[in-house]
Amino acid sequence: MPTNEEFYREYERLKDAGNLADAVAELEKALAQDPNYALAHSALAVAYGRLGKHDDAIKHGLKVCELEPNEPFSFTAMSVTFQRAGKILEAEDAMARARTLQAQR
């Protein structure tokens, strides 16, 4: 079975070739093997957002925040995901959390 890193490399190759749907499938395979693979969740949040699948993007973005609760970037990315989904209040809350975490460093 391929490693998480191998799935991710294939995702990047397919994404760079313009085949985002197949690229997403590679990350979903990685998550089937390791549901807590934060990098895959993060990439899926971006990819699903680009595909207009905002509910899926939010689901994966929230999982990243759950897996990395002390990482400001996770919440900054979540804010962008919420913005693209038209959820402005949630985006503002996520950005506030990112700023709080950054100030604690």
Describe the role of every protein-language-model region.
Residues 32, 66, 99-100:
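Amphipathic alpha-helical segments of tetratricopeptide repeats
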